[in-house]
Amino acid sequence: MIQSVRIKNFKNFKNTKIDGFTKLNIITGQNNAGKSNLLEALYYLVGKSMHPCTNVLEIYDNIRKEPLTSESKSLMFYGLDTKEEIQIVTTLDNNQTLDLQIKFIASENQKVIESQIIPTAEQTQMSSQLNFTLKKNNEEIYNDHLNIAKVPNFPPIPNQSGYNRQFKNFDSNQLQKLLPFESAVIIPSDVVYRQAHMIQAVSKICSNNQLEEELNKHLNQFDNNIQAISFNTNNQLKLKVKDIKEKVPLSVFGDGLKKYLHIVSAFMADNAKTIYIDEVENGLHFSRMRLLLKNTIDFINNNKDGNLQVFMTTHSQEFIEILDQVIREKDFAHQTKLFCLKQDDQYVIPRTYYGENLEYYFENEENLFG
């Protein structure tokens, strides 16, 4: 499991270290304090594919919906200053480290392009580069460039003219060296952005009768009128609902059910050992927040390897109060921490609150949100 992270020159993090992560980590803080940015920094290192270039592109293209170009690339750098390289270092609880450094390299052609008002078509496609260096325990595993065009095709289509975002994949030896680091799943605040990922996860679950039955039970807990989930011939998710003859498309249900399904299916279908959930409370009634937290703790406790780790961001005082109740009921307080991020001048300052003391913090009217 991830024990700590140090983030330098990434978005609003000039130089911040956060220590003491546990199995269930709740991230709070004021608006623009860096809650989502923290999840993204961790995901850059350990994303679904375990490849930093792929992880960065996924955040830009599928989460932020801001295609990575020679212009938008500066958004990942602190103060938009691409002269300083990004560094993200995570340490596991066994003291193994994973270190990612990202450096922008502007081509001479790109410098000319950016000085002109109207570039030619040929100049528009000339690419700059992001250099990625990935180390494990100070041993270099990967060092290569991701080419980025000024105006890429979007959505990006490989092997098409103008698609300049090539990079070198890991070979089997590099992948072996990355063990025991495991892949991760990120769930954004707006689940519509990741609809394809949810469909893929549910498809995997429905190919296994036992898992499909378990998923149906989870959906029935959320809404006891829901009896089953399935795909139609057009690969559209539909739900069998009590007293309705025709199956009902998932699209007509509210965001709360979609968010719940997305999270539960990620726990069930993915082999990820780390799950990042942004603005977990979005769309959820307080009773369903309780249900989600109970299920999350059950997934962590029932993980066969005992190393499943969850990070959630929230703005909701109500969610934290429900969390306090659930972790005491489930005897999980000692494996829960709350990290409050506060922007203090140039730096993000983390404050740590312990799950077993949440009730005490409430009684003393402690500000848990910065």
Curated annotation (Swiss-Prot):
Protein name, per record: ATP/GTP phosphatase
Keyword Signal: no
Catalytically driven reaction(s): ATP + H2O = ADP + phosphate + H(+); GTP + H2O = GDP + phosphate + H(+)
Physiological role: Has nucleotide phosphatase activity toward ATP and GTP, but not toward CTP, TTP and ADP.
Record lineage: Bacteria, Pseudomonadati, Campylobacterota, Epsilonproteobacteria, Campylobacterales
Keywords: ATP-binding, GTP-binding, Hydrolase, Nucleotide-binding
pH sensitivity of activity: Optimum pH is 6.0.
Metal-binding recorded as keyword: no
GO molecular function, one term: ATP hydrolysis activity
PANTHER family assigned: ATP/GTP PHOSPHATASE, ATP_GTP PHOSPHATASE
E.C. number: 3.6.1.-
UniProt cross-references to Gene3D superfamilies, sorted A to Z: P-loop containing nucleotide triphosphate hydrolases (3.40.50.300)
InterPro entries, per database record: ATPase_AAA_core, Bact_Antivir_Def_Nuclease, P-loop_NTPase
Temperature dependence: Optimum temperature is 45 degrees Celsius.
Pfam family for this entry, one: AAA_21
